[in-house]
Swiss-Prot record:
NCBIfam families: clpP, PRK00277.1, PRK12553.1
GO biological process: protein quality control for misfolded or incompletely synthesized proteins
Molecular function via GO: ATP-dependent peptidase activity; ATPase binding; serine-type endopeptidase activity
Function as written in the Swiss-Prot or TrEMBL entry: Cleaves peptides in various proteins in a process that requires ATP hydrolysis. Has a chymotrypsin-like activity. Plays a major role in the degradation of misfolded proteins.
HAMAP family on file: ClpP
InterPro entries registered for this protein in UniProt: ClpP (IPR001907), ClpP/crotonase-like_dom_sf (IPR029045), ClpP/TepA (IPR023562), ClpP_His_AS (IPR033135)
Keyword Protease on entry: yes
Catalyses which reaction(s): Hydrolysis of proteins to small peptides in the presence of ATP and magnesium. alpha-casein is the usual test substrate. In the absence of ATP, only oligopeptides shorter than five residues are hydrolyzed (such as succinyl-Leu-Tyr-|-NHMec, and Leu-Tyr-Leu-|-Tyr-Trp, in which cleavage of the -Tyr-|-Leu- and -Tyr-|-Trp bonds also occurs)
GO terms under cellular component: cytoplasm; endopeptidase Clp complex
Name of the featured protein: ATP-dependent Clp protease proteolytic subunit
Lineage: Bacteria, Pseudomonadati, Pseudomonadota, Gammaproteobacteria, Pasteurellales
């Protein structure tokens, strides 16, 4: 079980304690950490919808430190980022790999950031299938459809040609923050707090 720090604030009505993530949510900061999976994706989607209801004009900040995970869970987050009215700024702290990199690149244009020592990794979707030959064929076709769609979206976000992204994602492709910026996955490497 992970330890989650508690912060205490003094108010005119006394003390109020929050877990650190709830306190940061008040500042419109959402953390995407660890494997991208359905439960985590649902929590992030709910937080984005809540913040949109609170103020549809103010940006939301999605901090990413993830090795990637389930494509459909990541797409739930991605679609919500594009569905809601506020811009979603993305910031990589640590790593944004696989679906984490896809979500990082899917932030609002001009508002996609990484810290100087962050690592970004892009590759094609992974999958496995077992069962009857027909079932394996169906799964393979689905993975190929997802690969084409993710490659097209990443090309759109990065400004790179589809063919280049397709070639660059054939195998794990690791980048520094500066290399991710040069590739077009992010807009700026932050060395201090200035998300403009």
């Amino acid at each position: 079980m992970a330890l989650v720090p508690i912060v205490v604030e003094q108010t005119s009505k006394g003390e109020r304690s929050y877990d650190i993530y709830s306190r940061l949510l008040k500042e419109r900061i959402i953390f995407l950490t660890g494997q991208v999976e359905d439960h985590m994706a649902n929590l992030i989607v709910a937080q984005m919808l809540f913040l949109e209801a609170e103020d549809p004009e103010k940006d939301i900040y999605l901090y990413i430190n993830s090795p990637g995970g389930v494509v459909t869970a990541g797409l739930a987050i991605y679609d919500t980022m594009n569905f809601i009215k506020p811009d979603v700024a993305t910031l990589c702290t640590g790593q944004a790999c696989s679906m984490g990199a896809f979500l990082l690149s899917g932030g609002a244009k001009g508002k996609r950031f990484a810290l100087p020592n962050a690592r970004v990794m892009i590759h094609q979707p992974l999958g496995g299938a077992r069962g009857q030959a027909t079932d394996i064929q169906i799964q393979a076709q689905e993975i190929l459809k997802l690969k084409e769609m993710l490659t097209r979206k990443m090309a759109e976000h990065s400004g790179q040609p589809f063919e280049k992204v397709a070639a660059d994602t054939e195998r794990d492709n690791f980048m520094s923050a500066v290399e991710a910026m040069e590739y077009g996955l992010i807009d700026k490497v932050l060395t201090h707090r200035d998300m403009k």
